[in-house]
A protein has these predicted regions:
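Membrane-embedded catalytic cores of phosphoryl/pyrophosphoryl-handling enzymes
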Residues: 789, 825-892
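Outer-membrane beta-barrel channels and translocator barrels
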Residues: 41-43, 66-68, 78, 105-109, ...
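Long, low-hydrophobicity, solvent-exposed regions enriched in small/turn-prone and acidic residues
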Residues: 22, 30, 57, 62, ...
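Transmembrane beta-barrel domains of Gram-negative outer membranes and organellar outer membranes
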Residues: 21-126, 137-139, 165-169, 178-181, ...
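Transmembrane beta-strands of outer-membrane beta-barrel proteins
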Residues: 46-48, 59, 71-73, 112-116, ...
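Interfacial segments of alpha-helical transmembrane regions
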Residues: 786-810
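Short, non-transmembrane amphipathic alpha-helical segments
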Residues: 267, 298-320, 433-437
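Outer-membrane beta-barrel translocator/channel fold
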Residues: 73-99, 116-132, 137, 144-164, ...
């Protein structure tokens, strides 16, 4: 009987766990009101919202970037605290906060979900905290217990009651453990009087939309947001999408095709009506070749499928094979060969599946000069076919477009620019109209010009000049925005080349962008099968005058960047490293990481490390500023009733600085080719080929993340408990404490040495390298863990990540228990204040050193490379030289 009860409870608990919701708190992280939970949202969920709880208001966003990783960002306003003492125009103080959470354990019938999170990891650190939270579902009740350090000080709890019959309404209660006294301006705003306590709220969720009305100490707070599943294949049905070509025609014989040009012309006209451009046809015996591109349909495989339909309906009788060379910017990129035309027709007729068709299709990189000989017919259609459109089909409120049978086009559309965080005002904007014309003047040769008419703007209110000590390659941007209502923003000549299979090149000259013009070029190489691409770009540039016309400033520079793009073995992830010389003459590397979701949205971030030494605010001599930011590419076709290619890109950087900057490319080859490359490498390369979502029988290849035995973590609990009770473990702990105690004799002399050498070249170099080694080691271990080409290395790398995370958690716990002051506090090495809530900033043990040693140990043992411990010791030296820790902190 007891076994039956246990089984019933297990099934009930498991089923209820499936209903668990990960709703956002006022900071945007999955949680309750102010506190986080031990959950994260479903993979690919993007949320954006606004919250207000006096004195704070936030515009926030969050995304589940990976199946177990949730990231958050918010722009916080603190009411009643001036941003600048001598500048009332800026208004209240504002701060940018970046946070993240990792799901360590998924919920099971006997285990809660467990998550570790860090808040405010970059910037001012005003809201910095770290926490561990466990959540469990009990029917309609979701409950959380957790503990935090920093702003979240000590134990916290939360619960959400969401009965199905309430139709999206939920009741929320939490124990708020925030230490509001440490908040900026806590005395002036009155929030410093707020103590830890109970908060209550009512939630309402309707589809993608959600809201919360909360009360804390009798004061209301609100949170409203939208939640978008980026892993959905589409958001809006394509109600206005033109149907595929099904017009039945009398097909000519091969002799009729060769002698009567009307058949070629009819096929080209039919393709033109479906937005195909630069069409060239060639028939050789039983083989039909077509070279073309499509300017509307977003997936190359879908465009090729539509072209193949029309060719089958109008090709000569007896056609056995069809080859379609799909071009990008006039360059053939992918060749689709259909070896069995009859089987292809049966697929379009619904008589065969895509799985049956796929073995008879070859997709490869195109050879150079793969175009056919119907130029005369195409030239005759150029003037006849030129069409104009006035509509919103490309995602604009309205746009005027003109296009012909080639790649010539005219476009007039409105635009909006937004700028944050200038000291003379937090929000600046400009509304404008862009007029662009592009002309294909020859094979791969394009002429392009863009003008801008500013309709309205308040950028001219920017009064603070740039304080940058570097060449003002970006920080003078406000001068460019506010001078001249009519501007020539771009005037270019681009020549594209395709010298070899998988090799592409570009030569450019003219006005690249609003701030720079010059000459340059780029070469891109794709290997035959490897998941990476490599390009080199070199540009000789001169800075333009403000006003937007042909004048130039005296500043000239040459940028030279080599870029490696690597597609990680996890769905949609790409890592890019760009190394070389940037706009301000600084040398270094820009690291980028992004993920492409099934909807076509791309979300990513960048971080740049150069020798630019930007020490003006927000940088300091001790901590120079490094350019960083986040970006999102938005495929407008996913939000319209008709497919379209335009994909605007939004990029947000905390500050506009001159370090680590790049000029806008006249036509970045990798960006141009990436959509087609991604499409042709997506499983069998035939996504939506027949205008059908028929990939259900094409399961994605399991990734390393999929193969990780997360459940084994639960089984490891018994091993952990056994280890904690073993004599060997306590002997090792005792030896470690003994080493720390012995190293204590070095604390004072080492700190005196650090004081004497503060600011020296050696100290700066060691601190710069050693302080960043744990981050670099974690990043490298993460990439290697995802790379399944070497199972031994992948396993060691995942173990290193586990060890690093456990080391971080252990160091945080140790700081709380020991509470030792840091050298910079000036209290000496013997100042301890154990078990205090403020001990998150304590010194013993060093989190950097603990994590670094933990991460290198699995590699050192697996590959018998003890020299790696010397690399870890550099971090110890850096923490001491930077006066962040005593010697014994780094070995304890």
């Amino acid at each position: 009987m007891n076994l039956i009860k246990i089984a019933m409870l297990s099934v009930l608990s498991f089923c209820s766990a499936l209903l668990a919701q990960a709703e956002p708190n006022i900071n945007g992280e999955s949680g309750y009101i102010n506190m986080p939970s031990g959950r994260i949202e479903a993979d690919g969920t993007f949320r954006m919202g606004y919250s207000f709880a006096k004195p704070y208001s936030s515009i926030w966003s969050s995304i589940t970037l990976l199946p177990r990783v949730e990231l958050y960002a918010r722009y916080v306003r603190i009411m009643g605290i001036p941003g600048f003492a001598n500048n009332s125009a800026y208004g209240d103080y504002k701060d940018k906060v970046a946070s993240g959470k990792v799901l360590l354990l998924e919920e099971d019938w006997d285990m809660p979900s467990l998550a570790f999170g860090i808040n405010d990891v970059q910037g001012t650190g005003l809201f910095r905290s770290s926490y561990l939270a466990a959540s469990k579902q009990f029917g309609a009740l979701d409950a959380t217990l957790g503990v935090g350090t920093g702003r979240i000080s000590g134990a916290f709890a939360g619960a959400r009651y969401t009965p199905a019959e309430w139709g999206g309404v939920a009741l929320v209660v939490e124990y708020d453990a925030n230490n509001y006294k440490q908040d900026k301006g806590a005395t002036q705003t009155g929030v410093g009087q707020r103590k830890k306590g109970i908060g209550l709220a009512v939630d309402y969720r309707w589809g993608w939309l959600g809201s919360q009305l909360a009360f804390r100490d009798g004061k209301p707070g609100i949170n409203a947001y939208a939640s978008v599943p980026l892993e959905a294949k589409e958001f809006i049905p394509k109600l206005d999408e033109p149907a595929p070509d099904t017009e039945v025609m009398v097909r000519p014989s091969l002799e009729q095709w060769d002698t009567d040009p009307q058949y070629r012309r009819a096929l080209i006209e039919r393709l033109l009506k479906q937005d195909f451009k630069n069409i060239h046809l060639k028939v050789s015996g039983h083989v039909v070749e077509a070279t073309l591109t499509n300017t509307r349909i977003s997936l190359a495989s879908r465009a090729v499928g539509r072209a193949a339909r029309s060719i089958l309906l109008r090709a000569p009788l007896g056609t056995r094979e069809i080859r379609i060379h799909y071009t990008v910017s006039g360059m053939p990129f992918a060749t689709y060969t259909f070896f069995d035309a009859e089987r292809l027709q049966r697929y379009f007729n619904g008589l065969e599946s895509r799985k049956q068709l796929a073995p008879y299709v070859a997709i490869d990189y195109a050879e150079p000069q793969k175009s056919a000989g119907s130029e005369a017919i195409l030239d005759g259609l150029e003037q006849e076919y030129f069409q104009t459109h006035l509509d919103s089909n490309e995602g604009d409120i309205v746009s005027f477009r003109g296009e012909g049978a080639g790649l010539d086009k005219i476009r007039v559309a409105p635009g909006l620019g937004i700028y944050f965080n200038d000291p003379s005002g937090a929000f600046r904007y400009e509304v404008f109209a862009n007029a662009a014309i592009e002309k294909q003047a020859g094979t791969g040769l394009f002429l392009k010009a863009t003008t801008q008419l500013t309709v309205n703007q308040n950028v001219s209110g920017v009064t603070n000049p740039s304080n940058s000590l570097l060449p003002h390659v970006r920080t003078d941007v406000a001068d460019y925005k506010k001078n001249g209502n009519v501007k020539l923003t771009q005037a270019l000549v681009n020549q594209f080349f395709h010298p070899e299979q998988r090799v592409y090149a570009r030569a450019s000259a003219g006005l690249y962008e609003e701030m720079f013009g010059g000459t340059g070029g780029q070469v891109l190489y794709y290997p035959a099968r490897a998941p990476w691409a490599f390009d080199v770009s070199v540009d000789a540039l001169k800075q333009r005058n403000v006003g937007g016309w042909m004048g130039f400033r005296n500043y000239s520079t040459t940028t030279a960047l080599a870029a490696l793009h690597y597609r990680l073995p996890i769905s949609g992830m790409t890592a890019t490293a760009r190394t070389g010389r940037f706009l301000a003459g600084d040398l270094g590397t820009r690291l980028e990481m992004k993920r492409r979701f099934r909807s076509g949205f791309q979300v990513g971030a960048w971080y740049t490390l150069t020798n630019g030494n930007d020490i003006t605010s927000p940088g300091t001599p001790a901590k120079p500023y490094h350019d960083k930011g986040v970006f999102m590419s938005i495929p407008l076709g996913s939000m319209l009733t008709k497919d379209t290619q335009p994909t605007p890109r939004i990029a947000i950087s905390p500050w506009t600085r001159d370090v680590g900057q790049m000029a806008a490319s006249p036509g970045d080859l990798y960006d141009i080719m990436e959509p087609v490359y991604t499409n042709m490498r997506d499983r069998d390369g035939l996504q939506y080929f027949g205008d059908l979502d028929d990939s259900y029988d094409q399961p994605r290849k399991p990734t390393v993340v999929d193969r990780i035995q997360w459940a084994n973590w639960k089984e490891d609990r018994s091993h952990v408990l056994d280890g904690l009770t073993s004599a060997d473990t306590w002997l090792q702990v005792g030896m470690g404490l003994g080493v720390a105690a012995l190293s204590g004799s070095l604390d004072k002399p080492a700190d005196r040495w650090a004081v004497r050498h503060t600011g020296s070249r050696f100290s700066k170099a060691v601190a710069g390298v050693g302080n960043n080694l744990p981050l670099a080691a974690g990043g490298i271990a993460g990439l290697l863990a995802l790379d399944d080409s070497d199972q031994r290395r992948s396993a060691a790398s995942f173990t290193a990540l586990e060890a690093g995370l456990v080391g971080m958690l252990a160091s945080e716990a140790g700081k709380y228990v020991v509470g030792r002051s840091r050298p910079q506090a000036g209290m000496g090495s013997s100042d301890f204040h154990p078990l205090r809530s403020s001990n998150d900033a304590a010194g013993f043990p060093s989190g950097h050193a603990t994590a670094m040693w933990a991460m290198v140990t699995p590699y050192a043992k697996e590959y018998q490379t003890p020299w790696l411990y010397g690399l870890a010791a550099v971090t110890n030296l850096a923490r001491v030289a930077d006066r962040q820790h005593f010697v014994s902190d780094t070995v304890g």
